[in-house]
Regions:
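N-terminal Rossmann-like NAD(P)+-binding domain of SDR-like oxidoreductases, especially those catalyzing
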Residues: 1-101, 239, 245, 250, ...
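Short, glycine/charged-enriched secondary-structure capping and boundary segments
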Residues: 16-20, 58-62, 111-114, 146-148, ...
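Short beta-strand segments
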Residues: 45-48, 97-105, 135, 166-171
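Short beta-loop-alpha junction of Rossmann-like oxidoreductase domains
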Residues: 55-57, 106-109, 204
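Hydrophobic alpha-helix immediately C-terminal to the catalytic Tyr-X-X-X-Lys motif of short-chain
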Residues: 79, 83, 87, 117, ...
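C-terminal substrate-binding subdomain of Rossmann-fold SDR/epimerase-dehydratase oxidoreductases
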Residues: 126-262
Length: 262
């Protein structure tokens, strides 16, 4: 069995590191699929992304909606999904595509300023910095604590009913970005207010249906946002005070957001 989670998941940065994005998120994935065919892997579980839905549809996004990516990161995920379908039809590689979205929790990378909004805020609050929000904060997401994903991902490789299926995986309660930021500030007890930055190219309202994941993967949303962020904050306070990762040189500077300019 192969679980393919590896990716550089900085979706917002992907338009400015296009080659790096495709080398890491597409080419390496197709190499792994080729090896899986060659060595008769019994199941290939691919962690895709809700980003493949783009901004064409009104949420919640369901698995039967046609992919409509709006950035190179989502294009790479979509291409891998298509390659898996071909590998199944032509070579018999059994696969399951899981489209997780907005998972967070302990051991998450909080030192990368380009991805994982809750981790970004957590780093800022640990360092007594105001949390930053792109745009007006009215964007909507549904967050899930990482522990809630463990059993569903295991079942994705174990159940025959999951072969050849695409399954959303993620939270059942939506939050605006402003609300999520305030929940974290309250959890930390910090007397800091968010700072709003220029809006960026993104899908503003994005969350998915979850019924199929309950039926096929036994998904249960057990940890609410406040409880999950409390656990993550206690973990984060024990971590070393590391420098944040800064991308050394963008492949494309045209249109880069002021906040990311080196």
């Amino acid at each position: 069995i192969v679980y393919h989670f590896a990716a550089y998941a900085a979706e917002g940065l992907s338009p400015f590191i296009r080659k790096y994005n495709y080398d890491n998120n597409l080419i390496t994935s197709t190499n792994l699929i080729t090896c899986s065919i060659q060595y008769n892997v019994s199941r290939f579980v691919f962690a895709s992304s809700m980003s493949v839905y783009g901004d064409k549809y009104k949420p919640p996004f369901s698995e039967d909606m046609k992919q409509a990516p709006i950035d190179p990161y989502a294009v790479a995920k979509y291409a891998v999904e298509m390659d898996l379908e071909i590998a199944f039809k032509q070579h018999g590689l059994n696969y399951t595509i899981v489209r997780p979205h907005n998972f967070y929790g302990i051991n998450q990378n909080i030192w990368d300023k380009y991805r994982n909004v809750l981790g970004i805020w957590m780093y800022q609050l640990l360092n007594k910095q105001n949390p930053t929000i792109f745009g007006d904060g009215s964007q909507v997401r549904a967050f899930s604590y990482v522990d809630d994903s463990v059993l569903p991902f295991w079942n994705a490789s174990q159940k025959n009913s999951c072969i050849g299926e695409i399954i959303n995986l993620g939270g059942i309660k939506e939050h605006t970005i402003n609300d999520a930021c305030n929940v974290l500030i309250n959890v930390t007890g910090q007397n800091l207010k968010p700072v709003h930055l220029e809006a960026r190219h993104e899908t503003k309202y994005a969350w998915s249906t979850w019924e199929k994941s309950v039926k096929l993967l036994d998904f249960k949303h057990q940890v609410d946002l406040e409880e999950g962020l409390s656990k993550m904050w206690e973990w984060a306070k024990k971590q070393p005070n590391r420098e944040r990762f800064i991308w050394p040189k963008y492949e494309l500077n045209k249109g880069i957001y002021d906040y990311w300019k080196n």
